[in-house]
UniProtKB/Swiss-Prot annotation:
Pfam families: PGM_PMM_I, PGM_PMM_II, PGM_PMM_III, PGM_PMM_IV. This is Phosphoglucosamine mutase. Mg(2+) binds at S105, D246, D248, D250. It comes from Gluconobacter oxydans (strain 621H) (Gluconobacter suboxydans). It catalyses: alpha-D-glucosamine 1-phosphate = D-glucosamine 6-phosphate. Activated by phosphorylation. Catalyzes the conversion of glucosamine-6-phosphate to glucosamine-1-phosphate.
Amino acid sequence: MATKRSLFGTDGIRGTANTAPMTVEIAQRLGQAAGLYFMRSQNRRHSVVLGKDTRLSGYMLECALVAGFLSAGMDVILVGPLPTPAIAMLTRSLRADLGVMVSASHNPFTDNGIKLFGPDGFKLSDEVEGEIEDLMSQDLSARLASPAQIGRASRLTDAAGRYIENAKASFPRGLRLDGLKIVIDCANGSAYRVAPTALWELGAEVIKIGCSPDGLNINDGVGSTHPETLCAAVREHGADFGIALDGDADRVLIADENGNLVDGDQIIGLIAAFWKQHDRLRGNTVVTTVMSNMGLEKALAENGLELQRTAVGDRYVVERMREIGANLGGEQSGHMVLSDYATTGDGLIAALQVLAVSVETKRPASEICRFFTPYPQLLKNVRYSGTSPMSSPDLAAAKAWADERLAGSGRLVLRASGTEPLIRVMAEAQDEALVHEVVDHVCDVIRAIAHA
């Protein structure tokens, strides 16, 4: 039986580079354990696809993982800086046993992380991650490869081109982006080559920002965590669309031609309504998380569509989609999962679907990207030290008070961050003053608990 996961969080392993768990030693150990776990058959060669984003520490962790996989007897296919969804796609395409992405997504360059994908291109389950952790705690020396069985490392030189073609295949074949001026912000991250190229090949005039990575500037004032940069660039250049990706390009936000931001909820609603009109939305159901706006749920219901919510994290969205057979899901933060085209969140493919709606309907972004009127929503993060306040009776009482105040008109969501000592407090309701009252009170209670 697998032990409780301690290394793996809600999206792989993540932490400060060169500090546990993001050390050379742990990365090498992970490579050995994951390699041995996925080498089920001994009568053929086994392989892993290994990609990364543009962080300086990516070189260090990449080399450590390579050493671990090779010592386990697994061949390594290196693809260099590519989006996370590209690693998932290539793992399936190359019939590899495993895919690995070295990235901390939207975090600053000082952090890094490791995400694992199975041979089907989906993120590993909690159970499999737990079993790999079990292996990491064991003495593996007797199970490592003999000198003749050590793995080989090679580089896939056309990996970027393969992903570009895969992304373009999601765009209707009869359409082009001629006449559209598009600002693309790649967060100085892993999509800095592939995203502008894909848009240009489809006919767009492309203006690039956040496409000059130096190892230290990923997500630094650019990308989906700093959408104000994109919005300003759209206004400056008189562009028709703006697209902001995060460091590993698994999430996307849009700016319309006026430089107004469009979040993930609006993108989900737009795609859902368009797909329903064209009989492409499976089960008339969309999967989102507890953070998605109640306004989206109401608008979907008015269009005859059901919204199902999961815990925060695109992996949980994907799991629910697979359970019920849905083909559209995502998060307010910009993770968009379109399972007709990808097994995980893919910012570029999601952006192409929005562009396709605009081209097909001949309507500007400002018209198509306002699917619903959002309820006033407020999110605050409260940092703590020591024991998490989530199990405190005082916090339970505060939540009960908030639920009573919001009854019938709104909701409160409390969530512990999976990567930082933070409690996220989110409330929404049609009464904005009530939202602020509830969030401020609950945050005050958390602070009091943290300093008690």
